[in-house]
Amino acid sequence: MGIQILPPQLANQIAAGEVVERPASVVKELVENSLDAGATRIDIEIDKGGSKLIKIRDNGSGIPKDELALALSRHATSKLHSLDDLEAILSFGFRGEALASISSVSRLTLTSRTAEQTEAWQAYAEGADMAVKVMPAAHPVGSTIEVVDLFFNTPARRRFLKSDKTEFTHIDEWLKRIALVRGDIHFTLTHNGKIVRNCRPAMNEPQYLQRLTQVAGRQFADEALRVECQHDDLRLSGYLQSPWSTVLTDTHYFYVNGRLVRDRLVNHAVRQAFAQKAEVEQPGYVLMLDIDPHQVDVNVHPAKHEVRFHQSRYVHDYILQALQSALEEAGELGFERPFEPSSPQIRDEASLSETGAQTQTEHHAFELQSPESKTHSTWNEASRVDTSRAETSRESRIDSPLGERTRDIASARPYAGVQSNAYGSMAVPRESRSGSAGESRARAELPSKVAIASYGELLQTPSYSVQDKPYQPVLAMPAILNGQYWVLAQGQNLSLLPIQSVALATRSHEVETKLATGLIGQPLLMPVSIAADTDWPALLEEHETLIRQLGLELTIRYQQLIIKKVPPYLRDSQLAKVIPEWLQSLRFEAPAPNALAVWLAEQSLTGFTSAADIWAAYCQLTEEKRQQIADKAVSLPWQSWLEEQASE
């Protein structure tokens, strides 16, 4: 048999094997045509899972009479006219294959009318003969396409269809995905005469959140983090699953210029952004990327499920930085805003924590010692006892699932995960389901009368100086107030020491010590690329020693700054933002070592840090350094407050 050109009918049926996989594929192609026509309302009617009837009705621009027959021909389209158009595709369809392929395996009727026409026209095609009949019809401006008896002339394909319920589930799932990215469109979906889905236009964010709730579920919509980031021609928007949520979800939707695609690059960026921040392996997301159409190729997959970015690494790094920024901002908001429990259960726990803090203030067992004021050695014995108790409590909290959950929820606000009761032991668990249970737990954790009396005697013990005894740091961590301050006692004086300032001071000291010998750079899994300024090559050459000392590996190639290695203190920072800002500062003068240490410390403290770890680092500092930090404590005039209360 010699080589010959296939008949159009056979070629269309072969193409239908790629385009028309199942009824959901037909719905996808026809709805996308309606969207390309500028429709604002699309009604979808399905009968028997789509095997009997698929009917799409829209109010788009319509098709002129003389183009109806041509619309059902293969490789006929109004969306492309030149090779340049193929390199910058913004429409859903562009190959001109869908209608011809669908009509070759079904009985297709296309009715349409444009605004310029006074009457509508209808085109009918059936099966392999592909003969198109055009006749007058009644129809408003827009189009209606009916696909009847799908695969009627290909019995083998029809036998591979699943049950009506399964096929309709695929249709509904695809509609949910397109409804998320096209919130301005009114979609209705009917199955066997019953309205299954009615997505009204979402013209503002509250309305869009309602649509998001319909598609992704209420829990995802209520806990999702908003993403909004723009840089040059790239814009990323959408929603991320909360990193503190442990609920598994199948909401993994990514859109490029409004087109739903599957991309491993995006999945990798999401997993990397959520690394060590989420309980689930694959967090849910609804992300929409707007990019210059010249920078992406959508003509790489028969069903258009995949795309290829011209600068895939740049896009990956951009998405990664945008997601990391959203997660960091969520943590910062949690730190700046006092914790306000939303449920009665958590409110009860918060009140119990406050009660414990008040008890600490009145009968505090810990004291920050200074060279000027030393307490009796009995004090150190009490501290050691409480230290073992606190350590045992922390171990039990970490080992138990309950403790992990409490810590993760509090991680939205740094240091809140280590809130303690009157003696620095475990925070009140979230599983306190009733007021009586909470009260019994509070009574169990409050100090006994004997302990109160003992601590009262200690507070009354006069202080004295021990000049020949070396300074010993307190081993037990002080009580925490509101998740942000340590409550320190010096004699009968109380003061508040900001935990954040201690964290910054201890981390700065650590970094400055290591800077003397140079930081060790850690290679990035995916190097970060940034558009380079013209003077950056000179800056990199001038400050080469300093850059190497910081553990950075920066190169410039094709006018792009490539970040290959960073010190561990910059590992979780927004490199695409932090490094350019630092290079900008080098244009004026090289920073001093202490300024560099503070900068690196600030970048490394953007996430959750345990107050216990901060206190342990504080105790390792020298006496002089500890005293400098302690001087930042704010005194509490609790005695004058008691006098005012007594006078009233």
Curated annotation (Swiss-Prot):
Q: Which GO terms describe its cellular component?
A: mismatch repair complex
- Give the start-end ranges of region Disordered: 336-443
Q: Where is the signal peptide?
A: none
Basic and acidic residues composition bias: which ranges? Answer: 383-410
The record's InterPro entries line, in alphabetical order, gives: DNA_mismatch_repair_CS (IPR014762), DNA_mismatch_repair_MutL (IPR020667), DNA_mismatch_S5_2-like (IPR013507), HATPase_C_sf (IPR036890), MutL/Mlh/PMS (IPR002099), MutL/Mlh/Pms-like (IPR038973), MutL_C (IPR014790), MutL_C_regsub (IPR042121)
GO terms, biological process: mismatch repair
Q: Which Pfam families match?
A: DNA_mis_repair, HATPase_c_3, MutL_C
| Superkingdom, natural source | Bacteria
Q: Which Gene3D superfamilies match?
A: 3.30.230.10, Histidine kinase-like ATPase, C-terminal domain, MutL, C-terminal domain, regulatory subdomain
Q: Name one GO molecular function term.
A: mismatched DNA binding
Q: Which keywords does this chain's UniProt record carry?
A: DNA damage, DNA repair
> What segments bear the compositional bias annotation Polar residues?
370-381
Which PANTHER family does the UniProt record give?
DNA MISMATCH REPAIR PROTEIN MLH, PMS, MUTL, DNA MISMATCH REPAIR PROTEIN MLH1
| Entry's family note | Belongs to the DNA mismatch repair MutL/HexB family.
Give the function comment from the record.
This protein is involved in the repair of mismatches in DNA. It is required for dam-dependent methyl-directed DNA mismatch repair. May act as a 'molecular matchmaker', a protein that promotes the formation of a stable complex between two or more DNA-binding proteins in an ATP-dependent manner without itself being part of a final effector complex.
NCBIfam families on file: mutl, PRK00095.1-1
Q: What is this protein called?
A: DNA mismatch repair protein MutL
Q: Which organism is it from?
A: Shewanella sp. (strain ANA-3)
Specify the taxonomic lineage: Bacteria, Pseudomonadati, Pseudomonadota, Gammaproteobacteria, Alteromonadales
